[in-house]
């Protein structure tokens, strides 16, 4: 069973939307980025939720597109000395934790994540210290400082198995930061979980009422839902899973139409695998409401061509990720604990946002 803290409604200030580029400007930046990647011994690594042109450029230049842990692992294995991470700040930190000897650049260090922002390390540590008998399990979508306070770091693809393992040992659990994913796992496992009250601004906006209406319009469509969505939305799903798992489900399910309840950035890779299928954005607001994120992370949208080119060309403290070495070593412990557990289960760890 889960014990839920009082919900604190937080309205995160969104960054301004990037200024659109002309086709000529895009072509010029792409050409410059390709040249700079060679000159700087760098590789472009992009998250599924970045804009399609960024994902396409990463693949075209021998880089990678994936979820945050896959991104960090690819960067660790790649011979390039510099990794340019197109994503949000904790993804750059994850890459630095796994590969401290490499230079980690980001298009902007102001690309945040509402899950990270909603789980400040000092407050989370204070909360954990108040419950010393609990095992602390945190989602990968957190800062290095929060990871360092945890006993386990998990992604959504292995969270169920790890919580089941801890529950079998009768260990009460503190889960942070996503309340929807935590509630989903608690309901699936029956584990005793104390939930931190964070949420993803994109997934939190998906509406069950609006989704039912859309399903009535597309009765033959399958509904794919990320478990960071509200429980009422998850209940309507034909498939629930991480980014990688939803892409796999789109390929394996027989339906030719898919209503997809996650960031619409995923459509680029999903459509590559199922070009014959129709992908439909799940509605992010009910009748009479307006959306804020509108199914696309506003911080992911900051990873534009101009920002990537500037990061590669100029570098500097405005673009480079640094993690205190003592903190890095401490945060690596719960991360390796997950990877070792996955190896014993012979699972490939994927699936945080």
Curated annotation (Swiss-Prot):
Where does the signal peptide begin and end?
A: none
Pathway listed: Cofactor biosynthesis; NAD(+) biosynthesis; quinolinate from iminoaspartate: step 1/1
Provide an example Pfam family for this protein: NadA
Location of this chain's protein in the cell: Cytoplasm
HAMAP family to which the protein is assigned, alphabetical: NadA_type1
Protein family per UniProt: Belongs to the quinolinate synthase family. Type 1 subfamily.
Name this protein carries in UniProt: Quinolinate synthase
Free-text comment on the cofactor: Binds 1 [4Fe-4S] cluster per subunit.
Q: Which GO terms describe its molecular function?
A: 4 iron, 4 sulfur cluster binding; metal ion binding; quinolinate synthetase A activity
Q: Which UniProt keywords apply?
A: 4Fe-4S, Cytoplasm, Iron, Iron-sulfur, Metal-binding, Pyridine nucleotide biosynthesis, Transferase
- Cofactor(s), names only, from the UniProt record: [4Fe-4S] cluster
Instruction: Cite the InterPro entries for this sequence.
Output: NadA, NadA_sf, Quinolinate_synth_A_type1
Positions annotated to bind [4Fe-4S] cluster = 113, 200, 297
Q: Look up and give the organism this protein is from.
A: Vibrio vulnificus (strain YJ016)
Keyword Manganese listed: no
Stated EC number for the protein is: 2.5.1.72
Q: Enumerate the catalysed reactions.
A: iminosuccinate + dihydroxyacetone phosphate = quinolinate + phosphate + 2 H2O + H(+)
Alphabetically, which GO biological process terms does the record hold?
A: 'de novo' NAD biosynthetic process from L-aspartate
**Listed GO CC annotations:** cytosol
């Amino acid at each position: 069973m889960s014990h839920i803290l009082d919900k604190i409604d937080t309205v995160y200030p969104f960054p301004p939307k990037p200024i659109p580029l002309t086709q000529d400007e895009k072509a010029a930046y792409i050409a410059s980025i390709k040249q700079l990647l060679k000159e700087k011994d760098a590789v472009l690594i992009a998250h599924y939720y970045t804009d399609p042109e960024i994902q396409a450029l990463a693949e075209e230049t021998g880089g990678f597109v994936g979820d945050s842990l896959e991104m960090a692992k690819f960067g660790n294995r790649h011979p390039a000395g510099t990794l340019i991470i197109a994503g949000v700040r904790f993804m750059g930190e994850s890459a630095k934790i796994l590969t401290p000897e490499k230079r980690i650049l980001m298009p902007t260090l102001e690309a945040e994540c509402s899950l990270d922002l909603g789980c400040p390390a000092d407050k989370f540590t204070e909360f954990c210290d108040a419950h010393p008998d609990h095992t602390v399990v945190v989602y990968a979508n957190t800062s290095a400082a929060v990871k360092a306070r945890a006993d386990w770091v998990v992604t959504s693809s292995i969270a169920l198995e790890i919580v089941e393992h801890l529950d079998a040992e009768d260990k009460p659990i503190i889960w942070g930061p996503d309340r929807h994913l935590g509630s989903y796992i608690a309901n699936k496992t029956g584990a005793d979980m104390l939930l931190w009250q964070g949420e993803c601004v994109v997934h939190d906006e998906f509406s069950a009422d609006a989704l039912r209406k859309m399903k009535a319009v597309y009765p033959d469509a399958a509904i794919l839902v990320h478990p960071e969505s509200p429980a009422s939305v998850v209940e309507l799903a034909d498939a629930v899973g991480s980014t990688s798992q939803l892409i796999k489900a789109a390929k394996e399910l027989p339906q030719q139409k898919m209503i997809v309840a996650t960031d619409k950035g995923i459509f680029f890779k999903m459509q590559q695998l199922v070009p014959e299928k129709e992908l439909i954005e799940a509605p992010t607001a009910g009748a009479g409401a307006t959306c804020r994120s509108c199914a696309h992370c506003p911080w992911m949208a900051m990873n534009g061509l101009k920002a990537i080119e500037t990061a590669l060309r100029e570098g500097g403290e405005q673009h480079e990720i640094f993690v205190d070495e003592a903190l890095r070593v401490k945060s690596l412990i719960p991360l390796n604990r997950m990877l070792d557990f996955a190896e014993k289960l012979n699972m490939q760890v994927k699936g945080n946002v």
